A protein has these predicted regions:
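Iron-sulfur-associated redox domains of electron-transfer enzymes in respiratory
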Residues: 1-132
Length: 132
């Protein structure tokens, strides 16, 4: 199950995430289902660069997800700050705040890329669950 967290994006990635959830792509066949609470999630989808105001919230959200967990960085802004990289209000890319397991590049990434990333994240989650 997947929890989405916007850490300061322009909403381009969110539009593509919504497109990914449409019947055309049917992500539930892969076990992809959005949940409203990080306490019920296995995977965190984080979009956007982390603003200074969101840095603590991102950390708290990460801590609320039960182990094992996988973090996905969706979009170029989350990877490097994107067009906002030199903004005074940024804490930095996502991996400066929490560990990231899967990166999905693009501005914004296509739904197919997001699905591919989630499938990779679920495979990693299965490996983590199988580990002693």
């Amino acid at each position: 199950w997947v929890f989405h967290l916007n850490s300061g994006s322009c909403n381009g990635c969110e539009i593509e995430i919504v497109a990914t959830l449409m019947p055309r792509y049917d992500p539930e066949r892969f076990g992809i289902k959005l949940v409203g609470s990080p306490k019920h999630a296995d995977v965190i989808l984080v979009t956007g660069p982390v603003t200074k105001k969101m840095a603590d919230r991102v950390k708290r959200t990460y801590e609320q997800v039960p182990d094992p967990k996988v973090v996905m960085c969706i979009g170029t802004c989350g990877e490097s700050g994107g067009v906002f990289y030199d903004s005074y209000s940024l804490a930095g890319p996502i991996d400066d705040v929490i560990p990231v397991d899967v990166y999905v590049s693009g501005c914004p990434p296509r739904p197919e890329a997001i699905i591919h990333g989630v499938v990779k994240a679920l495979a990693k989650l299965e490996r983590l669950e199988a580990a002693p």
